[in-house]
Structure formats: C-alpha cells, structure tokens
UniProtKB/Swiss-Prot annotation:
The keyword Lyase does not apply. This is Probable ion channel POLLUX. It is found in: Nucleus membrane. Residues 1-11, 52-66, 118-149 have a biased composition (Low complexity). Induction: Not induced by mycorrhizal colonization. Pfam families: Castor_Poll_mid (PF06241), Slo-like_RCK (PF22614). Residues 1-76, 108-158 are annotated as: Disordered. SUPFAM superfamilies: NAD(P)-binding Rossmann-fold domains. Expressed in roots, leaves, stems and panicles. Required for mycorrhizal symbiosis.
Length: 965
C-alpha cells in the first residue's frame, strides 16, 4: 500500500499492480511541501489502473501527496481542503485530499499550482471519467493488462513522488506571476506634436522679433529724416498712435500669442505627465524591474522640501526668482503686443508687478490682457512676500517670547534650574546687589519663558534695581549654556530638581560635566545644591576647585537639631545668612599685620571679627583663633558686618576687663527627643545628637517605616546602631496625622519634638507642609490636655545660674516641650503666627540664603561648613550671667573681651524686653546697664558649646496660629 503523506510513496511488489499488501504502518506526519499537478493523461491512467488494487497504488494527482482509497484511509485522519475542486467528493468524506491543509486559502493562490476553478464546468472526457471513478464508492474493475508505456510512466511518476524536488526544479514548475501593467498615458503622438509645435512657435517668435526690430528701425529712420515720404510718415505715426491695435488683428500677432501660450503650457504639461514619460523610458530599457521606483514628481518635491528646509533664505530666493521670471515673461509679452522697446516693456512689466493699478492706462486688447496677467501675478508675488515677512516677524517675536535669544551680559549671576527656593534666592541676590545699584540675574530652566516670568512676577518683594532675565533651555546642552553667556558669569548656581535625591544629584553631576565642557572656560565659581551628602565628593571630583557644594537636606537636618537644643537659633541664623542685616565678609587689611587677634577683635567699631584666613596655609580659614595669634602678611580678617564697604579698622578703644563671674560647672542631663517622620539623612541627625546629648538620652522615632526597614536604612547610611553610647533608640510605628496614633505616645514627657518633612511626601511641598502643620496642631492639643496634671520637672532644671526672664517665660510652670516643625514652603510659614521664638518653623529659606551667600563669596562656604558641622566651632546662645553681674555697666567691647576668657566670640545680644536679637550692634563703645535676663549670641568651640547648651534649655508658651484649621 502506498503512503503518500509528506510527499513520499512506498510501492509494493516492485511497482506492479499485483502483490500482497504490506503490513499497515501508522501514518507519518504530513510535511509542508509544495505540490505539483500531474498531467491529465497520467492521472487518467492512474485512475483506470489504481482502482483495481488500492493497496498497491502509488500514483496521485499531485506529486507531493496521494489520496488514500476510501477503504485504506486510516480513521481519524485530519484533512482540511483549501478549496473545493470539481473532482472532489461532494460530501467531503474520505476522498478529500489530505494535502490541501498545507497551504491556507486566505494567503492567496499557491505559487506552484493554479487553483482549480469553482465552476462546475465539464472537464475533458478522460479527466471527467477518472474523477467519476475516483469518487465512486465501489471501486471499478481494473483492466487486466497494462501497457508497458503506462508502467514506465507510472514508475517515473513514482520516482518523482519519492524524490524531493530541488529548489531549481520547484522554481521551474512555478509559473511566473502575470505582469500587471500600470495604466499610463501614451505620450507618443502628444510628445511628437508638442515638440513640433514648440519648434514652430520658437521659430515664429524669433521671426516676429526680427520683423519687429526691422520695423522699429524703419520708424526711427522715418522720424529722423526730414525728406521722408509723407505717406510713410503717416503710416508710422498711425502705428505709434494705435499702440499696437492694428498689430493685434494681424496674423503675426495671433501666431506669437499662440506660441507664447504653448511655451507657458509646456512646463505644466511636463509636470503633469513627467512620471508617465519616465516610466515609458524605463520600460523600454528593461521589461521587468525588481526595485521600487519613486516617481519623479515626488523626487522633485522632496528636493524642493530639502532645499527650503536646509537654506534659511530659500523662500526669499524662490520669491525673487519667481518675480524675475514674471517680469521677464511679462516684458517679452508687452514687447510683442505693443510697439515699445524691449527695455521699456521690461520697465512697464515691473510697474505692473509693483502696482496693480498701473495697467488701467493701457489701450488695446493685447496690452490690456498682458498687463492684467502681469498685475495678477504681481498681486500673488506681493501677497507671498507679505506672508513671508509676516512669518519671519512672527517667528522672531515668538523666539523672543520663548526665550531663545542670546543674553549679552558680563559679571552676572546665572541660575541653572528651577525649584521652590528660587523666589527666596532671587530676593537675597537683589538685596545683595542693592549697594551697587542692582545687578543682573539670568535664569536658565527647562520651562516656558512666559511661565517663569509670570511666577517671578507673583513674588511679593521689590528687586531694588536688579533685573531678572529668563531663558528657556536645558543646562545640559552647551548651546543653551552659551546662549546665557555662561563663560562671562561671575557666579553660577545649580539648583536641585524636584526629583528624588539620587536623580537630583545625578542631574547636578551632568550639569557640572556640561559646565566643564565649555571651551571658553568659566570666569566665576559654581555653587551646586546637593540633596545627599554621600554624592558630594563625586561632584567635587568632577568639577575641581571651581565647585562649591551646599548639601541642602543635611543643612536643614543639622539646623533643626541645633534649634531644638537652642530655641531661637533659627532667627539668628536668618539674620546672619540673609543680606538684610549683618553677614560674613573676608577682606585684607595691611595695617593690621603684626597685631594680635585679641587686639584685632576690638579694632572695628562697625564689625565683629570672628576669624582669620591664613595665607601661609593655602587660604585656610581659622574660626575663633587664640588671642595670641599674630596676623602675618597676606592674612585676611573674617568679620560680621552690614556690608563690605561699611567697616574699616580704627584705633584701639579703652576697655574694662573686670572679673568674670565664677559660675560653677553645671551637670549635663539626659534629654528625651521625639522624631515624627522619616528623612533621608536621619542617620546624620542621629550622629549629631550622639555628639551633643548626655549619656542616658532617648531618641524616639515615630513614623510609618517598619522597624526592620529602619535598621536596614540606618545601616546602609553608615551608622552603627549598636555603637551608640549617649542615646538609646526607641522605635514606634504609626501615622503622625492620626490622633489615635499620637495619643499612644507620652508626648508630655519629651523635651524636644522635631516634626520632619516625611520622605514619602517630600516631592510635594504642599502635602509635606500640610502634614507638618496637622501634626503640630495635634501634638499641641494633646499636650494641653495632659500637662496640667503633670508634675513640674525636676528642680535641677531651675538651678541658680539660669535667671533670664526670656528663658523662664518659655520654660513656664507646665514645662511644655519645644516643637520644631520643618516647613519647605516659606509661604506656608506665613500662615503661622509663632508665639515668642521656641516653636520656630524652619523652611528652605535658610538654604536659599546660604546659596546666595556662597554665590557672592565662595570663601564663606568654609565658614558655613564648620558652623553646621558637629565638630569645630558653632553658634550658641548664652545667658548674661556667664559674662556679667546684675545691673553691671559695661560696653559691648568689654563683654567681647570677657568672653575671650571662655574662648568665645560675642557677635550679638538680645535684651530681655525685645523680641529680636541684634547682631553686630552699633556703638560698641557705649556703656550701658545690663540685666541677667539678657542673652548673648556667641561663636564657641565645640566642647564648650556642647557643655553650655545642655545648661540653657529653653521652653515655650503654647503656639498661637492666625489661620483656622
């Protein structure tokens, strides 16, 4: 029996019609092979012979697959027909071809065989008989004998079935698809006619031109010769007087007009049928093209588009060319239809183009038609010109409006980026430039210029002569940096973006790389606002000596720690960092060389010296040096003054040193502090507390971060949780804006409570401030209900050395906790009316002040880094009892000299009855009566500062808010 699946057949009995059938084998998997239709004679022979012995049949209608007889077909054989040929079984039963599934019908006709027609037309007699025999359920009796030729043909066909066809044979069997000729316009007669007409028209035009030239020469000769014949003169004047009206009616003019119209129509005709002409030429060269051809019309349009896009003056040149062509063609037409000269005709053509009303004076049909045509073209040309001019003006104005023009400035301050600190930063820069009559600040950000100007216009302060210029662009693109004259700026400030810390610092690093790539170099230094302290070394490594970094997030955290331990310090920092009052300045005074620092300290009536920039140590700034330090040549003095031109050294005043009060060393007491929220740099804040607090202190951390996650984050930050010696960490989980969660905490027992801007909502300053204010109100309300039943704190808090009424007023009988709330938006702080100074709302305004100060003088960054660090010198608040006695009369210079015995520099004071501290007071030599309720602001060494901070803990009254919640 034959197995025809997959294009193979196994003959039995040597290919004869007789023999015992082979044992049945399971059908092989069908193979995806192409089919080939066998000729009708072979198929009919197979039908006549193969039905006699179905088990030994090997021939099929298609060489790749043989249909099994109905009796021998295995049951369950899946067969799917592509189509329904005329010779298929009507019921689609066992006689259905099992090869037809290989090629789906929805893919179109098979390349190797034509699809059989669906119509029920009669095939030839032999084919119909064979199909009828194959469809009959009862096999017909086979012939007794078979001719030798038939057997040979059957063997050859069997060999074809068994042997897989090669690729070349399959290609030969597949008829080529019929060529589909695209419909085209036959240009042969039209092209010949067009060429003939063109040649004739051109010849007639030349002949007419020559004839008109000869006629003009005759007219000129008639006008110049006095003996000319009267008749000739009359005819000449007649021709000139009629302005060509007789010439219009002549056959010559008609031929010239027709030829001119045909000449103008030729380009239009070529543009319309150029593709058909090109296709005809290519078809004559090659009959069949395998590559896709682009029409010439599209090619021309593409070239024109590239030309207009790549050349800035392409539109203007095209308009100029069109105008020249219009004037030239119009001049030629006027020259033909009128009796004027060629140059005169060109001039008339130009006047018709320039002014559409000039053609009204023309006489005669020909000149009028030509003049109207020229005027119409002129109106089109001028309309196009107006459109181009309007587009150019609009594009230029739009470029100015969008901030794409170049900034031509020198010694300006350049701000790269946009953030919520920009408003307060511009305010501080405007105040700093007030003394010089104002300056220029350029802002480059990836925002629309109009939006930036609108936001800056909403700021409620006067710029005092400082102009702010906004430009839209990316700080990462060198072209945009050159647009704002980055190489000529005296200072560049890179603001942190509103993204998370790592993304913001990564962007700042890319901006620094862009700045270092400026070929012209940078004249000023670069101040970079960083978000994470760990990324600071990388930025400094890339930028080099020009880079000054201000780690905003860490600065806020450390300031909050200092303000929690010393309430009132935030206001003092605002006075020093802001340009409205006193600030840091560094300047060299040669007349002070050789003087001791103790004498330099009292040499400035309008400033307070607090450090020295040592020239011999590569410009290192030494804060709070010893009294015996002698200024060398090149050393500069660091002072706190109103402005850089408001102080000069003077002669030494007379001071009374007196005796320093003998205050016993107070003991240090443990503190209990609560952190509400989670910050990225909370590990740094914990280390600052570890350095400041006494042993046995507790730090409660209340937030929504799981305890294991907290330990992991603290460990990743580089902190040894089990290595803390002074503080003990207490973890509590909860939401700081849910009252039920807050009531589970002993809020009345905490000495200080810090409400942190939560890390989960720090990207939105509005949400962060809302959470902070809600937490502050809830804590105050819970404390007010619990504190009356609470006993007073230990009398150790009220030892004899703390007599300030300002401090006693904040300590109060109920001993309320100090609450420091972190507010990111300065506008939110304006909604809160703070009672006294304890519950101070800290905002990003301090960071903006630090950025502005470092931008004005990069050396100040060394001072701020030391004052913000947990080591070195820091700013503190001291009670007057450490420097004077009750009602003692002293000058400010006397107190400065006494403070030197404690290695401190007094920079200001606050009287008992005042709400504002005075930094760098005037009239320092004036003697006044002091009270023990007064306090002084000093710069002290880290050891002394930590010691005295613990003895002057301040407490506050309840906070009063002006807004209603």
């Amino acid at each position: 029996m034959a197995e025809s699946d997959g294009g193979e057949a196994s003959p039995s009995g040597g290919g004869g019609g007789e023999g015992s059938p082979d044992p049945r084998r399971p059908p092989a998997r069908p193979q995806l092979t192409k089919s080939r239709t066998i000729s009708g004679s072979a198929a009919s022979a197979f039908d006549r012979w193969g039905t006699s012995n179905s088990s030994s049949s090997i021939l099929v209608r298609r060489s790749s697959t043989a249909p099994l007889p109905p009796g021998a077909a295995p049951r369950g054989l899946l067969t799917v027909a592509v189509d329904e040929p005329s010779y298929a079984a009507p019921n689609g039963g066992a006689a259905m071809l099992d090869r037809d599934w290989c090629y789906p019908s929805f893919l179109g006709p098979h390349a190797s065989r034509p699809r059989p027609p669906r119509s029920q037309q009669q095939t030839p007699t032999t084919t119909a008989a064979a199909a009828a025999d194959s469809r009959s359920p009862t096999p017909a009796a086979p012939p007794q004998t078979a001719s030798v030729s038939q057997r040979e043909e059957e063997k050859s066909l069997a060999s074809v079935v068994k042997r897989p066809m090669l690729l070349d044979e399959r290609r030969s069997l597949s008829p080529p698809p019929p060529q589909q000729r695209a419909p085209r316009f036959d240009l042969s007669p039209y092209l010949v006619l067009m060429l003939v007409v063109t040649v004739i028209s051109f010849s007639l035009a030349i002949w007419q031109w020559m004839k008109a030239t000869v006629l003009q020469e005759k007219i000129r000769s008639c006008c110049s010769v006095s003996t000319v014949d009267c008749k000739t003169t009359t005819e000449a004047f007649k021709i000139n007087g009629q302005h060509g009206s007789d010439f219009i009616n002549s056959a010559d003019w008609n031929l010239a007009s027709c030829s001119r119209m045909l000449v103008f129509a030729i380009p239009v005709f070529l543009v319309k049928y150029i593709d058909q002409l090109r296709r005809r030429n290519t078809d004559s060269i090659r009959l069949r093209s395998t590559e896709e051809e682009v029409p010439l019309k599209k090619r021309i349009a593409y070239k024109v588009d590239v030309f207009f896009s790549g050349h800035p003056y392409a539109k203007l040149l095209a308009l100029l060319l069109a105008t020249i062509i219009l004037i030239a063609s119009g001049g030629i037409a006027l020259y033909v239809v009128s009796g004027s000269g060629f140059l005169e005709a060109l001039w008339l053509s130009w006047t018709f183009v320039a002014d559409s009303g000039n053609h009204a004076d023309q006489v005669g049909l020909g000149p009028r038609i030509v003049s109207v045509s020229i005027s119409s073209g002129g109106m089109l040309v001028f309309a196009t010109m107006l459109g181009l001019v309007s587009d150019a003006i609009s594009e230029k104005v739009d470029s100015w409006r969008k901030g794409k023009s170049e900034v031509i400035e020198v010694n300006h301050i350049l701000i790269l980026g946009w953030s919520d600190k920009l408003g307060s930063l511009l305010k501080q820069l405007a105040i700093a430039n007030k003394s010089i009559g104002g300056g220029v600040v350029v802002v480059l950000a990836e925002r629309d210029k109009e939006e930036m100007e609108m936001d800056i216009g909403k700021l409620e302060f006067d710029f005092m002569g400082t102009s702010v210029i906004c430009r839209s662009g990316s700080p990462l693109i060198l072209a945009d940096l050159k647009k704002v004259s980055v190489s000529k700026a005296r200072a560049i400030i890179v603001l942190a973006s509103d993204e998370n810390a790592d993304q913001s610092d990564a962007r700042a690093l890319r901006v620094v790389l862009s700045l270092t790539g400026v070929k012209e170099g940078l004249r000023g230094h670069v101040v970079v606002e960083m978000s994470d302290l760990d990324n600071e070394p990388l930025v400094k490594l890339v930028g080099g000596e020009l880079i000054e970094t201000v780690v905003a997030h860490d600065v806020i955290g450390r300031l909050m720690i200092q303000c929690a331990l010393q309430p009132g310090l935030a206001q003092i920092w605002e006075d020093i960092l802001g340009f409205e009052n006193a600030e840091f300045y560094i300047k060299r005074w040669p007349e002070l060389d050789g003087m001791r620092f103790g004498d330099v300290l009292i040499s400035f009536p309008d400033a307070v010296p607090c450090g020295v920039k040592i020239a011999s140590k590569a410009g290192k700034i030494l804060m709070n040096p010893d009294n015996d330090y002698v200024l060398q040549e090149g050393d500069e003095v660091l002072v706190i003054a109103e402005d850089d031109d408001t102080y000069v050294p003077a002669s030494l005043p007379q001071v009374r040193k007196g005796f320093l009060p003998n205050i016993p060393t107070p003991p240090k007491y443990p503190e209990k502090i609560l952190f509400c929220g989670w910050r990225r740099d909370i590990h740094d804040m914990i280390m600052v507390l570890e350095a400041f607090l006494a042993p046995g202190s507790e730090l409660w951390m209340f937030n929504e971060v799981p305890e294991k996650e907290r330990e992991r984050k603290l460990t990743d930050g580089g902190m040894d949780i089990y290595g803390l010696t002074n503080i003990k960490l207490v973890h509590k989980e909860g939401n700081a804006v849910i009252r039920r969660h807050l009531e589970s905490l002993p809020l009345e027992t905490f000495d200080s409570i810090l409400i942190l801007a939560d890390e989960s909502v720090e990207d939105s300053i509005v949400h962060s401030d809302s959470r902070s204010l809600a937490t502050l109100l809830l804590i105050r309300d819970i404390q007010s209900k619990r504190l009356p039943s609470k006993e007073l704190k230990s009398p150790l808090r009220y030892n004899g050395f703390c007599h300030s009424s300002w401090i006693r007023e904040m300590q109060h009988a109920s001993d309320k906790s100090i609450i420091i709330s972190e507010i990111l938006d300065s506008r939110t702080r304006n909604l809160v009316s703070v009672s006294k100074i304890s519950d101070y709302v800290l905002s990003n305004e301090l960071v903006s002040m630090a950025l502005a100060m470092v931008a004005e003088d990069k050396q100040i960054n060394r001072v701020l880094e030391e004052l913000f660090a947990e080591e070195g010198n820091e700013m503190c608040i001291r009670s007057a009892e450490f420097y004077l006695y009750e009602q003692e009369e002293l000058s400010f210079f006397d107190i400065m000299v006494r403070a030197r015995e404690r290695d401190e520099v007094v920079i200001g004071y606050r009287l008992a009855n005042d709400d504002q501290a005075i930094i760098n007071p005037e009239q320092k030599s004036e003697i006044r009566k002091w009270s023990l309720d007064d306090v002084f602001v000093v710069i002290s060494k880290a050891g002394n500062a930590t010691y005295f901070v613990k003895t002057t803990v301040m407490r506050s009254n309840p906070v009063v808010y002006s807004s209603t919640f």
